[in-house]
Regions:
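Inter-helical turn/loop segments and adjacent helix faces that build the functional surface
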Residues: 206-212
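Conserved aromatic-histidine-acidic binding/catalytic patches
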Residues: 44-60, 64, 181, 185-188, ...
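Amphipathic, Lys/Arg-enriched alpha-helical patches that create a basic surface
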Residues: 147-194, 198-199, 212-243
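Charged/polar positions within long, soluble alpha-helices
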Residues: 21, 28, 65-76, 198-205, ...
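Charged alpha-helical initiation segments
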Residues: 1-58, 70-77, 82, 88
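Generic structural signal for well-ordered, non-transmembrane alpha-helical segments
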Residues: 7-10, 14-17, 58, 62-66, ...
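Beta-strand/loop-dominated core regions that host nucleotide or nucleotide-derived cofactor-binding catalytic loops
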Residues: 245-343
């Protein structure tokens, strides 16, 4: 599952947080210096704050842009583990790919694409279109040139078949908790960061400086947005797996015990192994909707047997009708479905 892009962003944001924490106490520390030093600090402090503000915004947006593009590439890398053929990819990706491949081929002189060779591009295109392998080049979808406002982010991910990003993202933690307290603002802080970055890049006067505490609020918001986006993308990957991967069996719960944390199933001719792969599909109003898990320890008995026949199992090759149950970390309903995979 996706996590590398988020971890790298958190590391970079941590550097910005530490800098602003230090910068906010710097005047107090420096004023304890000599009189001459205090005069120098007082006279130059406005310029220092302007430079600090510009550095913060440029750094923050740079981290965010890097995260968005890294997430797109990581999403494709994870797709390789799910979609083993070109035809298994979303229609939007297949429809856009050739034109974007052509555009990338003409931009290989850009610094960000210099590790990609024409030979590699031709080989990957041949393997994808002729041999039906999933060897798409993620960089084909990284050609917007930056300025990742909310609408640009939406467009970037819509080419991957993810058309409901802006409508759905706010339902994932931690944004859902943030917006429940502050009201939904259409992710406006992201656009504000981009606008401020563009003003600085084009030499506008810094008339509207942000305090270190407000900068840290922006940093915290970017981190929340990134966490929710990563959860959303992982959910989309698991949804794709649900659609195309062939499970051994899809089961549904029939009974619930101990405040719904123990779920019971009734299946015929079932094979169960502790720690076998499971993919849980929740109803539409749950976020995230898909959860990848391992089958926990379970108990089972023949369907017609008495309750005293229930035993603990690590592995079961059950001919005929069987009842089995296991404990979960959350409540299920009869609308939940669980896909079981033997390998």
């Amino acid at each position: 599952m996706m996590q590398d892009s988020l971890l790298e962003l958190k590391k970079l944001l941590g550097t910005i947080k530490l800098h602003n924490t230090c910068f906010s106490v710097l005047p107090t520390v420096l004023k304890s210096s000599t009189v001459n030093d205090k005069d120098f600090i007082t006279n130059s402090w406005t310029n220092e704050r302007i430079f600090n503000y510009r550095s913060n915004i440029i750094s923050l947006y740079g981290c965010f842009e890097q995260f968005i593009e890294s997430s797109i590439k990581e999403y494709f890398n994870e797709l390789l583990k799910i979609c083993h053929s070109f035809t298994e990819l979303d229609e939007s990706i297949r429809r856009e790919y050739i034109d974007r491949w052509k555009t990338l081929h003409g931009r290989l002189h850009f610094n960000k694409f210099q590790t990609i060779t024409p030979t590699f591009m031709v080989k990957s295109l041949y393997n994808s279109l002729v041999k039906d392998k999933n060897e798409i080049i993620a960089e084909c979808f990284l050609q917007n040139g930056g300025n990742y406002k909310i609408e640009e982010i939406r467009k970037s991910f819509s080419t991957l078949g993810l058309t409901n990003l802006n409508e759905t993202l706010r339902n994932y933690e931690p944004l859902v908790s943030y917006y429940s307290q502050n009201g939904f603002d259409n992710y406006s802080k992201i656009d504000e960061i981009v606008d401020r970055r563009n003003e600085i890049a084009h030499g506008a006067n810094a008339d509207d400086l942000l305090s270190e505490s407000i900068v840290l609020d922006y940093v915290d918001y970017v981190e929340m947005y990134a966490e929710s986006l990563t959860s959303y993308l992982n959910d989309q990957l698991l949804e794709h797996k649900w659609k195309i991967a062939n499970p051994y069996r899809i089961i549904k719960p029939i009974n619930f015990y101990t405040r719904n944390s123990v779920v019971e199933f009734h299946e015929k001719d079932i094979i169960l192994r502790e720690k076998m792969d499971m993919l849980v599909k929740k109803p539409k109003d749950y976020f995230p909707r898909y959860v990848r898990e391992k089958l926990p320890p379970f108990r089972a008995k023949k369907a017609q047997a008495s309750l005293s026949a229930i035993k603990n199992y690590n592995e079961l090759y059950g001919d005929g009708d069987w009842m089995f149950s296991f404990q979960t970390n959350y409540k299920m309903t009869t609308k939940f479905r669980i896909a079981l995979y033997l390998s």
